[in-house]
Amino acid sequence: MKITALASAILAVAQGALALPARAPALDITLSQVNNTRIKAVVKNSGTEKITFVHLNFFNDPSPVKKVSLYRNATEVEFTGIKQRLRSDGLSNDALTTLAPGATYEDEFDIASTANLTQGGPVTVRTQGFVPIAMNNKIAGYIPYSSNELELEVDAEKAVAVPASIKPLDRRTKITSSCTGNRATVLNTALRNAASIASKAADAASSGSSALFTEYFKSTSGNIRSAVAARLKAVASEASMNGGGSTTYYCSDPYGYCDSNVLAYTLPSTNEVVNCELFYTLQEVTNDCHGQDQATTIIHEFTHAPGVYPPGTEDLGYGYSAATALSTSNALNNADSYALFANGTSSFCVMTAFS
């Protein structure tokens, strides 16, 4: 029933590229094969002005993030790396890249480290999305990026030899032993708040202001509203389970991928959610319109987990400017669209078209 609601909603809107603003600068990505599953990406500033952007969750991020999408026979290959939620201000300088007009940089990575390509054969590689622009170490906007389509013939024997970026852990418990003392208290409060906010957001998606809904999802269709409500209800249900749901929750980082810019991350392939140190510096619930807090960070991460509501979301547009520039079909598949909508409904953000 979950899949049907989302599938019918996506079929109800045009299947197309990301909605891009007029006259926007852009990054062009050229993908090429280095050796079997090892890929090189050349990132070029194709605009006329110097730009500084956040390269986390993007090319040059050393963590096993989703840099490209892989397809076999038009079906996307499951991603087995991590999806991070970043801080929106106070970004460290080492998270930023500056490119002059026409300038480039390169990144090499092995796609077999974050996807099971052991059966070999033809695989199509491509990518597109938005990357955040930074000013004064704060996310201040976005620029679109897109790549060529790269066709590979994967050698299965060589793909098997590539080590996975994420090593499996013992996941017998749902809220792990890392969640004790104050961190357990913080997590339980955050889960309760996330459940309440997601539930209210689900109601707003179903029957609230059409102008508010359109601000985030670019549609007033009943199917679209039902699909958004269904995912948010599933998130509210998961947050109410107190460890008995589909996700495994870590209050500290067992894999070593947190840094000073990452609030939390999710491993969609195993439905694991990890809080980083930065998570504990956030407010429980913010009153700032489109601000970050613990509750909506959990909402963001739970939408990534397919065990909560399949399929899990991507990070197609990060932050309010990028998320609200997405087409309907892409907003439905974007984690921050749900977190921002939930924040907007709970803190009564006033939209320009609010009715």
Swiss-Prot record:
Major location (coarse): secreted
Cysteines paired by S-S bonds: C179-C251, C258-C276
Domain of life: Eukaryota
Listed cofactors: Zn(2+)
PROSITE patterns: ZINC_PROTEASE
Family: Belongs to the peptidase M35 family.
Sequence positions that bind Zn(2+): H300, H304, D315
Cellular compartment(s): Secreted
Catalytic residues (positions): E301
GO molecular function, one term: metalloendopeptidase activity
Pfam families: Peptidase_M35
PANTHER family: NEUTRAL PROTEASE 2-RELATED (PTHR37016:SF3), PTHR37016
Entry's cofactor comment: Binds 1 zinc ion per subunit.
Propeptide: 20-172
Name recorded for this polypeptide: Neutral protease 2 homolog AFUB_100460
Function: Secreted metalloproteinase that allows assimilation of proteinaceous substrates. Shows high activities on basic nuclear substrates such as histone and protamine. May be involved in virulence.
